[in-house]
Amino acid sequence: MDSHAGNTADPRGSRRGVGLQGSGSPRARQLLERLDARPLAARAAADLSALVRKAGATLRLRHKEAISGLDSADIEVADSRLPHATLVEHRPQHQRSDTQGPRMEPLPVIQNKASYASRLPQATGRFSVELVRGPAGFGLTLSGGRNVSGNVPLAVCGLLKDGPAQRCGHLQAGDLVLYINGQSTRGLTHAQAVEWIRTGGPRLCLVLQRPQEMNGSRSKEVGGGHQKTDRIPDPRGGRMMESRGTISPVHHRPKTRTGPGPSPESVATGHVVRAAEHPAEDLEDRIPGSPGPWLVPSEDRLSRALGIRGGGVQLAQEMAAGRRRH
């Protein structure tokens, strides 16, 4: 509505309507709820202009503040005032945006604080507990703190039965106390921590961390390392060996003789070399790239080829005698 509606006379011929006296009379830039018993919500300016033109010389307006008090006002508008009726639709939109603006601004701030509080325990592995002092205190005992021997982490020692700490359902014995009412417990003595709790008021806010969450990943890594250094069976026999301390069996090649004659030590002791040659041939067969057993003749074949009778003992004696001659 325009401010001309509040004047007693208008130069363009409009006259003041009935019922404008008193506190219930409409004011300029006032939110309008209904126009001729029709709600104005979600109506465009063209629709409002059409309603004003169809209303004739009398409009019945109901402002928004009068809904609760069931109050209304009658205003007579001449045809010359019809172009000014378009202000009715523009003013409530501007006023509504102004009134709802301050209400919507604090909401993102509150949501950011709530989301940060919910993300804090997940991101750092910590959790917070707020306790209210009961008749017997907060119902928990502490252990640790800085002393003469060293700095022991401050932790929850025990929970009083049916106390506030036990009823909250989050605390356990052994939880590390990191903060007391927003203050870090690093470097605190046991007496100082107890004094902070006593003088902190009826509410106690603790930030804690469970030891299993800190050492869980470390224990898994150590356990996996032991499994890697476990002993494995030797493929050459029932003997066990460690993978880090021993060399692969491929590098352990047995030393075998390729010559046809026995060593001087075997001749001196009188041992027959035939029994030692067969395992040597078997080992040479297993190693790829080594010469076959046909290149290393046995003593029987060699003695038969040379026409020597008496077997390997006589052959060994003759070969030893030949070496002495040379």
Swiss-Prot record:
Coiled coil: none annotated. It comes from the Eukaryota. It holds the Pfam family PDZ. The keyword Phosphoprotein applies. SUPFAM superfamilies: PDZ domain-like. Residues 128-212 form the PDZ domain. Residues 1-32, 214-267 are annotated as: Disordered. Keywords: Phosphoprotein. The modification Phosphoserine is found at S263. InterPro entries: MAGIX (IPR030031), PDZ (IPR001478), PDZ_sf (IPR036034). Residues 218-242 have a biased composition (Basic and acidic residues). The keyword Cytoplasm does not apply. PANTHER family: PDZ DOMAIN-CONTAINING PROTEIN MAGIX (PTHR47646:SF1). This is PDZ domain-containing protein MAGIX.
